[in-house]
Every structure is written in C-alpha cells, then in structure tokens.
Amino acid sequence: MIDFTSLLACPRCDKPLADLSCIACRVDFPVRDGVPWLFAEPDAAMTEWHNRWQLALANLNQDKKRVRAAIGKNSDPQTLVRLELLQRGYVEQKKCLTRLLEPLGLQAQADLETHLALKTRPPTQQGLFTYVANLHRDWCWGEEENQFGFGAIKAALQGIEPDKILVLGAGAARLAYDLHQSLESAITVALDFNPLLVYAATNIINGNPVTLWEFPLAPKRSEDVAIQRILSAPDPVREGFHYVLGDALRAPFKPGQFDAVITPWFIDVVEEAPAKMIPRINRLLGHGGVWINYGSLAFDQTNPANRLSLPEFISLSTHCGFTDIEAVEATVPYMNCPDSRHGRLEDVVTIRAVKQTDASQPERHQALPDWIVNGKRPVPLTQSFQSQATITRIHAYIMSLIDGKRTLEDMAGMLEQQKLMQKAAATSAIRGFLITMFEEQGSGRGY
C-alpha cells in the first residue's frame, strides 16, 4: 500500500512534509478527527471556518425566532403544523451540526497577521452551508445523478485503473467514494476546503450514518418543509481512501504524484483564471497521467475573457501540456430532490486529457494584494471602488433618513435637495433599495 504522507508537500513552500510538518516553514499541520488540515495557514483557516460556523449558527437562531413569532400570530391548524415542523427542524439541525462540527471548536489561537502575510483565505462567497444539499443528494436521494456522474468518469478512464487518484473539489465525496470502491486503486485522495462536507462524508464513508435535516427549496407538501435524513454509504470505504482539508489553489502535494486527477464541478467555479488553474492541475500529474473534468463548464469569472467556451477550453488545455483531449456532452438531472418542486436538467461535459509535457507554472496563488497585506502601499482608486464609494454614501444617507416618520416621497425630495438625484429617479431608486432591505430581512437560508 502506498504511504499517503509520501505524496504530501507544504502548501507554503512546496517542500516535502515530514510527519505532517514543514521543517523549512516551522509549521505543524494539525489532524482533527482523522482529517489533516493542509491549508497554508492551518490555524487561521480553522479560525476562519469557526467564525463562519458561529455566523451560520446566528442565522439559524434568527430563522428559528422568526418561525416562533409566526407561530404566535397564526391560528390556522394546517399552517401551525407546518410551522411547528419547521421550528423543530431548525432546533434538531442545530444539534446535528454541533455534533458534526465539533472539530471547529478546537481551533488554535487566531494568527491574523500570518494569515494575511500568506495571502490565503477561503473564498468569501463560500459558506459552510453553500453545498449542504450535495450531502443529501450524494448519500440519500440522488442515486440516478450519482451513477451518471460515476459512469461518465469511469468511461473516460477507458479501462485504466490508476494507482493514485486525486479528486479536487471532492465536496460530499460520493464520486470519490464510488471510484475508490470500484477501481481498486491503491490510494484515492479527496480534497475539499469545506469542513462540513468533509466531516459529514468522513463519518458516512466509514460506516457511521449521519443525521441531518433537509429544508427543500420548494417543498411539495407541508410535511416536506423539514425532513430528517439518514445519510449513509452502501458499504464502509475500503482501505486507502484519504480525505484532506485544503485549498486546491495551493494543493499540498508533490509534483507528478498522481496517475489521475478528477475535477468534478470544479474548474468553472474556482476563483482562479483557467489559464492558471490548468497548469496547476498539470503539475499534480505524472507524465501520461489522465485529467478528467466533469461538469457544466459554465465559467463564473469577472473577466469576460476567462468565460471559456468548450473549444477555447480544449485549446487552452493543449497549450498547458495536455494531449489526446476528448469531450463527451450529455443532459443529466441535477439536484432533483424528490420532495421539492425545484430541480433542473444540466448539460454537462466530460473532458478527458492526457499529460504530455510539463506546463509552465504560475506564481503561487495569492488571495490578497500587497496593499491590503502590508498596509504600506497606496490603496488604488479603482473604478469599482469609486462606484462603491458613491453607492455606499447614498445608501448611508438613505438609512439616516429612516426615522419612522418620513415617507418614501419625503426621502426622495431630500435626495433632490442634496443634488444627489432628480426626484423621479430618487423615488425609483429608494423604492428598489427598500425592497431589497425588506426582502433580505425575511430571507431564508439553506441548512
């Protein structure tokens, strides 16, 4: 059996690790409940996720209070049954999550300065619960979708059985689990940065079912507003499967260690431009190794030039050291919870590429610019900052006008007096702003 630790490298300096420690950086990478935290700054990452967990708890408590208040104002028997079930779901979900995320209560002392200096942090748009529905799909009701994804990946392997597989952005890990169970590879490494997905899946694949509540987006029946799910794997995962908490943009592995790298629903949602991310994937593969990308290939990038079409993606991959590139397209069900009226079909593409040559590597990923990190360079007056400054001033002024007495028309007149906007435009703008504020105060969240 291949020694898992022999594959690892420091995400700070890329030097090999010794017993999950980097001698050069003088950093020990902790293991919490059997999962190594291989972020560039593990203590800061743990603190960051702990803080996000506390924020999520506060939001959950707020929603619970909102439901309790609604119960007190309603007398319809059917409505009360639905609201009481929703309230129970929130209460029980908090208990389930607290048990599951116990490792986040063991975080070390925060080291913000080191965190900043390394310019690493989890993406701000990714919360603990961003992909919680994937747990229910992977380990409860999504067998059709799971099997299609697994079948597409297995077909793309074209009969080879890699000794070392890496799944980047493994999420709730059903695909990584299915590959490991069926291909009899010596070792499978699943990397993700979300501790909720990682700790839930770690329990599940090791034969310890996890209880969580699902709150379908569009419940079909009143009793579907909050559903207790038992998430379990068909069988305990066989030896050789390793879960890692880390950042794929600073993947903690030595170069050329893997025979296959799988990127499911990953390459088009990661924050880095594909011209940088594809070479990083190349680096992880040995010569002749296979890269398989699976997903919708719908790039979400600020720069329009990075929202690649399939032909552009294939061309770029060729320039990044890959050859024999094949693409297969299909329409598949996506997140079709049987208890929700919400679901869709997704056009996915499975891309197979073989590493032919090494690719020139971009600079180490930095999430933060120097003018934020060291504080000694001028903050650039970008167009975005100028626009945001104006918007913020107007929003702050509007909020200052809310005193419980002024009408929307009164406020629009005052904006005109301040020569910020014409009254007709101000009326429309304030109405839109207040609509957003009103809707956000009652918005629900996924748990």
Model-predicted regions and their roles:
Residues 30-157:
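Conserved Class I S-adenosyl-L-methionine-dependent methyltransferase catalytic core
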Residues 320, 334-376:
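Core SAM-dependent methyltransferase catalytic element
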Residues 246-261:
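A short acidic, Gly/Pro-enriched loop at the edge of an enzyme's catalytic core
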Residues 205-250:
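S-adenosyl-L-methionine
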Residues 288-297:
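Conserved beta-strand signature within the Rossmann-like core of class I S-adenosyl-L-methionine
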